């Protein structure tokens, strides 16, 4: 299940206990990141700027 975000960069996110799913406004593709803990998913959902959170805590750290 994808959760819509109020973000100029990210349209929706999801998490299944191990994988984080991210869909950006610029693409219909849903990107999958493996080994992402709940704390990162929750931080992304609750962030004032999900795009900034994504770049600081997810991009380049999870594949």
Regions found by a protein language model. Give the residues of each.
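Acidic/histidine-enriched, beta-strand-rich ligand/metal-binding domains
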Residues: 1-63
């Amino acid at each position: 299940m994808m959760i819509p975000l109020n973000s100029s960069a990210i349209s929706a996110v999801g998490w299944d206990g191990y994988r984080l799913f991210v869909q950006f406004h610029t693409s219909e593709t849903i990107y999958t990141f493996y080994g992402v803990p709940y704390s990162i998913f929750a931080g992304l959902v609750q962030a004032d700027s999900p795009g900034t959170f994504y770049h600081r805590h997810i991009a380049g750290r999870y594949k």
